[in-house]
């Protein structure tokens, strides 16, 4: 039985010509979000951060970027994310075309020591030789980069150093050269997450030796 990848963070970053976030524009965003988000102080001049503590979601805006982050036990909802980002897009009078980057972070039960299992699975040399070359070797990471138009993707698997009973899984996908609608972005983000938790997870288990 496949051990699931538990989502810990989903982040979607839209590049957009937002411009100066005046106090009036900030208030319009807050009004449109109907009190669900509260402003949060950030050490970046001109940036605007909003947090929904109940849902563990955050929005971060600069003059050139709109970023959505969900943390905790994430259950990504394309429709909710589209509604939320769409409200901000409309208040700021942005065109519905964005280059975007997504990042997904997950943890996966190692069913043992993630340190040991990555050394056994990922070393190009016999593990005993690798340990001789690197005394005190703790673990190894694997990074896979690939393209699936319009996306350039990056998948990383390594031990979770704060708790070696788990693997740390990170997946990035970016469409930096292609402008996409918000509806397409959240749909594709949902599809990538499903693939990460499905076929990619199956491949990860195969690479790790089951």
Give the label of every model feature segment.
Residues 29, 77-88, 186-196:
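Well-ordered, non-membrane alpha-helical segments in soluble/globular domains
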Residues 68-108:
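Aromatic- and glycine-enriched beta-alpha-beta binding-site module
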């Amino acid at each position: 039985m496949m051990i699931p990848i538990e989502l810990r963070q989903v982040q979607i970053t839209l590049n957009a010509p937002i411009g100066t976030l005046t106090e009036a524009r900030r208030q319009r965003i807050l009004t449109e979000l109907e009190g669900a988000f509260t402003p949060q102080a950030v050490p970046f001049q001109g940036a605007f951060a909003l947090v929904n503590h109940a849902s563990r979601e955050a929005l971060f805006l600069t003059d050139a970027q709109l970023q959505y982050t969900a943390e905790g036990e994430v259950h990504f909802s394309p429709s909710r994310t589209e509604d939320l980002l769409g409200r901000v897009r409309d208040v700021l009078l942005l065109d519905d075309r964005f280059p975007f980057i997504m990042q997904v972070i997950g943890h996966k039960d190692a069913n043992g020591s993630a340190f040991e299992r990555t050394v056994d699975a990922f070393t190009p040399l016999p593990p005993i030789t690798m340990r001789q070359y690197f005394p005190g070797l703790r673990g190894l990471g694997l990074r896979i980069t690939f393209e699936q138009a319009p996306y350039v993707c990056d998948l990383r698997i390594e031990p979770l150093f704060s708790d070696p009973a788990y693997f740390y899984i990170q997946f990035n996908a970016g469409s930096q050269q292609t402008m996409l609608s918000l509806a397409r972005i959240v749909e594709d983000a949902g599809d990538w997450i499903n693939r990460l938790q499905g076929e990619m997870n199956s491949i990860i288990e195969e690479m790790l030796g089951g």
